[in-house]
Design a protein with these regions (language model features):
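Active-site cofactor/cluster-binding pocket
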Residues: 2-213
């Protein structure tokens, strides 16, 4: 078991995004990597109105002993938002003192906005920071698209998350090898590496206004 987490420490992680973004896969890979290191792991998920296009959140908790799969508000060590507005929606789960919010700088416009019922709320990263949250925005969708498939943005974000989670690099690579089908494996390993590099690159964190789809 990794020595960076004490026997009494439980690490709390929340993935949030829109159905179809690979939120569940991101959480599953994280959970499997933790299991491979001998941690007790609990995971749960919540879907929105529709499985594709609706809000999706997944909680992952790991430590020497974990009793509940649910992360309570204000207790998450890491929130991974695969979409800007979803990151804002679940920001209150982050620990204000020690937590981190990773945000994919990508906007998925909901139907209500497309139908002109309301405006998409821009400035989410700035708003979260104004409330005291530590936020790192990443251009995960662009990085994934540059690698040939924007759908790998979730793996880019996993790569970024791996730089702050107390799990060794080899555990992530071994999990990706086991979980990703062979024909997609190399491209996903490249996406994972791109996420790690971006998370460590200060300039990469100065992302422009989120793109729209």
């Amino acid at each position: 078991m990794a020595s960076t987490v004490s026997d009494g420490k439980v690490f709390n992680l929340l993935f949030a995004g829109v159905g179809g973004q690979g939120v569940l896969l991101g959480a599953e890979i994280t959970a499997l990597a933790a299991v491979s290191e001998g941690y007790d792991v609990k995971q749960t998920e919540v879907h929105g109105v529709s499985q594709r296009g609706g809000s999706v959140e997944t909680h992952v908790r790991f430590g020497a002993r974990v009793w509940s799969p649910v992360v309570t508000p204000g207790k998450a060590d890491l929130v991974v938002g695969l979409e800007v507005l979803e990151a804002l929606r679940f920001a209150h789960f982050a620990n204000l003192r020690e937590g981190l919010i990773l945000v994919n700088q990508h906007e998925i416009i909901p139907g209500s906005v497309k139908n002109a019922e309301q405006d998409y709320p821009h400035g989410s990263v700035e708003f979260m920071r104004s409330r005291g949250y530590r936020v790192l925005p990443l251009e995960a969708s662009r990085l994934a698209r540059d690698l040939g498939d924007a759908r790998m943005a979730n793996v880019v974000m996993i790569g970024a998350a791996s730089t702050v989670l107390p799990l060794p690099h080899d555990a992530w690579l071994e999990t990706l090898h086991r979980r990703i089908p062979e024909r997609f494996r190399q491209s996903n390993l490249e996406a994972f590496a791109a996420g790690r590099e971006a998370a460590c690159d200060v300039e990469a964190l100065r992302a422009p206004r989120p793109e729209r789809s």
